[in-house]
Amino acid sequence: PTQQNPIHISCSCLMDASKTPIFWMLTITFFICGLSSTGIVGQHFIPFCSDNNVGAVVAASYLALMGIFNFLGTLGSGWLSDRFNNYNLLAIYYGLRGLSLIWLPYSDFDVFSLTLWAIFFGLDFIATVPPTVRLAGNFFGPIKGPIVFGWIFASHQFGSAVAAFAAGETRDSVLTYLPAFVVAGASCFIAVMLIIPFRKHKPVTA
């Protein structure tokens, strides 16, 4: 395989993976991951805070705090992914993320609530990546797994783009970010429902 055209290898892996339910589950949930993280929070958290009388510099500080706990959360998620059921972890991560996104618009946007949110959401921000990578490796093998994850990651970026655009359009139309954040949070619960049927799914490739 190393002597083949890399584009052919990549497309061949995609064709094979697209015939499996696990690929579509991971692809759709990772689309939701991008939508509910970098797409809406990465692009719209600061202007959302500005709409609630929180200065841009202060809001950016909360975003930086979120980044610190994102680092810790990702490390912790990697450790957990080596030891526990990755489906359960993903379901928990998406569920908690959904709750935090829905809670934010109804918070007071004061120091306590924004600090609490930044820590909580930060721990969950990239936590979905380690179990997603591990599941891709488990099901598609050490050679195809990374390539398949590359395609799955493309859906993450597409989800980010959709949320970045749609949340901005919604804000301009209804003059509030509340619907966008609630919809993003609700989408996380869709991810949970997609994951649950796979909890006892076994790898089909070595």
Locations of the language-model features?
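Extracytoplasmic gate region of multi-pass secondary transporters
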Residues: 15-77, 163
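Hydrophobic core of transmembrane alpha-helices in multi-pass small-molecule transporters
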Residues: 31-32, 113-127
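Cytoplasmic membrane-interface "Motif A"-like loop-to-helix N-cap segments
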Residues: 83-94
